[in-house]
Design a protein with these regions (language model features):
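Short hydrophobic alpha-helices and adjacent helix-cap/hinge residues
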Residues: 1-125
Length: 125
């Protein structure tokens, strides 16, 4: 089910902030494999959707489909199960019991040489 307009705006802004913390670019290319969040880039200042993971800086995925990509790209889950099932996922943003949750995987942050701003440190596990 697609997100409601106000929820979409909030999720877009959060994903925008997370993405810019992970990737220090003004325009971040995103490959989206999550039907619920397909319009996320419409309300973002930095995210631009691309049609192939080989063009992307980051992939947003719900984990329902396997993604074959020739390029090394960051994987960010849009639900908890996808985060747990994908060892490549650097983090996740999802709602649980009506509350937003953010998680980052410490070992993958290190592997990609990513240091998050202090405001995100409490979400690292």
């Amino acid at each position: 089910m697609p997100l409601f307009s106000s929820e979409l705006i909030i999720v877009s802004k959060i994903m925008d902030k997370i993405s810019t913390a992970l990737i220090h670019k003004n325009e971040i290319l995103v490959f989206i494999k999550d039907k619920k969040n397909v319009e996320i880039t419409k309300h973002s200042n930095h995210l631009k959707e691309v049609s192939s993971c080989n063009e992307a800086d980051i992939i947003f995925t719900d984990g329902k489909e396997k993604i074959k990509c020739n390029k090394k790209v960051l994987v960010f889950a849009t639900n908890y199960l996808a985060f747990r099932k994908s060892p490549k996922a650097i983090g996740a943003f999802f709602y649980q019991k009506g509350r937003p949750n953010i998680i980052f995987r410490k070992e993958n942050l290190k592997k990609h040489n990513i240091t998050l701003p202090k405001e995100f440190e409490k979400y690292i596990e």
